[in-house]
Curated annotation (Swiss-Prot):
Protein name: Putative pyruvate, phosphate dikinase regulatory protein
Enzyme Commission number: 2.7.11.32, 2.7.4.27
Family as reported in the entry's similarity comment: Belongs to the pyruvate, phosphate/water dikinase regulatory protein family. PDRP subfamily.
Catalyzed reactions: N(tele)-phospho-L-histidyl/L-threonyl-[pyruvate, phosphate dikinase] + ADP = N(tele)-phospho-L-histidyl/O-phospho-L-threonyl-[pyruvate, phosphate dikinase] + AMP + H(+); N(tele)-phospho-L-histidyl/O-phospho-L-threonyl-[pyruvate, phosphate dikinase] + phosphate + H(+) = N(tele)-phospho-L-histidyl/L-threonyl-[pyruvate, phosphate dikinase] + diphosphate
GO terms of molecular function: ADP binding; ATP binding; phosphotransferase activity, phosphate group as acceptor; protein serine/threonine kinase activity
Positions that bind ADP: 153-160
Transmembrane segment boundaries: none
Role noted for this protein: Bifunctional serine/threonine kinase and phosphorylase involved in the regulation of the pyruvate, phosphate dikinase (PPDK) by catalyzing its phosphorylation/dephosphorylation.
One Pfam family here: Kinase-PPPase
Keyword annotations: Kinase, Nucleotide-binding, Serine/threonine-protein kinase, Transferase
Amino acid sequence: MKREKKSFHLHMLSDATGETLISVGRAVASQYTMSQATEHIYPMIRNKTQLQRALDEIQQEPGIVLYTIIDKKIKILLRKRCEKIEIPCIDILHPVLNAFKSYLGIPTNLRVSAQHGLNADYFRRIEALDFTIEHDDGQSPNSLSDADVILVGISRTSKTPTSIYLANRGIKTANVPLIPGINLPDTLLGAKNALIIGLIASVERISHIRQNRNLGDDFSLESYTDRINISEELTYAKRICERFSWPVIDVTRRSIEETAAEIFELLSRFREGK
């Protein structure tokens, strides 16, 4: 009898791009073949406001927390919150830094992103991450025209994690929710220099993800997870994409990396056609 994989949430917080952290997290998670990690990636955590956004999501979807953060105050706040909700919180660099310090006999020179050096590619990715975080979930609509890629779709179609993945590769990415009855921002329709892509998924996948999400009092869990409602939302999203000739990617059976690979291909063709 085939056993079902156990799913869990893996939260990864970094004060830089998070590449080191993501590599370690995925390497460890891959050793547990009977488990499937749902990744939540939070790059550029450098102040309490940015941390609080991550903590809110960790509170809603508890799991394993990994981090690479230098600021002591931020680390203490993170650890205290994780202790309060009784979930593991691991600083993946701490034991390595201590080993170096002990062997070399010299103090650690703690600098954010020290491993990257000051090169143009690094600054490009940092700029893309800043832009992407600022333009998550329909925020800052007035500067959508500065995006390289804009992802649109209904709730829980992997818009945010895909945006972060693209930003880590230097692509300024915004994402805008498609909600029946809510007008699209004029700046979205006016973003002629950005590639706009619709993300969809199966009704079953979206319903499952939404059922696992702990919603606030302002939401009706029943209507949010109802398959008929989700089907209507998807129909609306498909019609919008068809009306404006936006390409659509079905993420149902795609990993974030696979979705991003298709987006890179579409972006290459889009830029060639300009």
